[in-house]
Amino acid sequence: MFDKIEELERRYQELEALLSDPAVISNQPEFRKLSREHADLTGLVAAYRRYRRVLEEMEGNRELLADVDMKEMAEEELKVLEEEKERLEGEIQMLLLPRDPNDDKSVILEIRAGTGGDESALFAGDLFRMYSRFADVNRWKVETISASESERGGFKEIIASVEGEGVFAKLKYESGTHRVQRVPETEAQGRIHTSACTVAIMAEAEDVDIDINPTDLKIDVYRSSGAGGQHVNTTDSAVRITHLPTGTVVACQEERSQIKNRAKAMKVLKTRIMDSIQQEQNARMAADRKQQVGSGDRSERIRTYNFPQGRMTDHRIGLTLYRLDAIMAGDIAEIVDALRAHYQMEALKAQSEE
């Protein structure tokens, strides 16, 4: 393990020299790429350097054990240093885990009403508000790309971009089926209904990630329409793009400008195609190692929100919290952090077994 760390430390020193090179600084794409690599290694190198200092301090204190006057102080210091050594070893192991290259990216968020009719559409709206408020706390920007509103409120489907630093790292484990149990406002008997929505979190594709041949696209334009089907625009500003090789279809009508709608639709199209490729790769890797850590399987029921009990349960990690109002208001940091910690430990176990 330490041979690998020392190799990475040498690379870190090499990067520090490169980032002060005028030729690299003048090449902004290369400078940004090397800066990201440098930032990724900073935590590991700092932890390893502190670890080496702790080992040196422990050796110095062991030498003091032979001194009667210094023995008691040295023993106390060794105890503290041993605890720090163990903590640093765990931290270094975590920092050595392969980093998801998508973690720093913005995302495309898709929420679709599933079983449960109107109640499911209302819950889709609740989930969108929950993620929007969590985004506000993290100072991320949320922009609706397309929305199919339900006549009784909420959404049959809503697609939005969430832009900011480390969005995918925090939201990637939200993909899956979210189940809600509550009494609908129209339920006279007070019976609890169960409905569900699916959430998809996809790392936003960048131009360098995927190249789409324009001849593979079929682009249709039409008039925008509202929730009841009425036309709300007198020009053909809405855009529907079909990627012929995969059959992927994306429509956008949120903007008054056809150019802006086309740009938004292309962003979603590229992201979906890249996500599909990555899902296939993940499935192949999972088949190879017989398990998939943090798969984000879209068909998996990941969470239940029980309103009568004020309870949220995440079924993947057995986490239950009785503060549903706060969670629906966007206070999901505890859930996000617990999921990230769980899947880091799973990855660590898988790495130690290989």
Curated annotation (Swiss-Prot):
It holds the Pfam family RF-1. PROSITE patterns: RF_PROK_I. It is found in: Cytoplasm. The modification N5-methylglutamine is found at residue 230. It comes from the Bacteria. Methylated by PrmC. Methylation increases the termination efficiency of RF1. One of its GO terms (cellular component) is cytoplasm. SMART domains: PCRF (SM00937). Keywords: Cytoplasm, Methylation, Protein biosynthesis. InterPro entries: PCRF (IPR005139), Pep_chain_release_fac_I (IPR000352), Pep_chain_release_fac_I_sf (IPR045853), Prokaryotic/Mito_RF (IPR050057), RF-1 (IPR004373). One of its GO terms (molecular function) is translation release factor activity, codon specific. Belongs to the prokaryotic/mitochondrial release factor family. NCBIfam families: prfA (TIGR00019), PRK00591.1 (NF001859). Peptide chain release factor 1 directs the termination of translation in response to the peptide chain termination codons UAG and UAA. This is Peptide chain release factor 1. The gene is prfA.
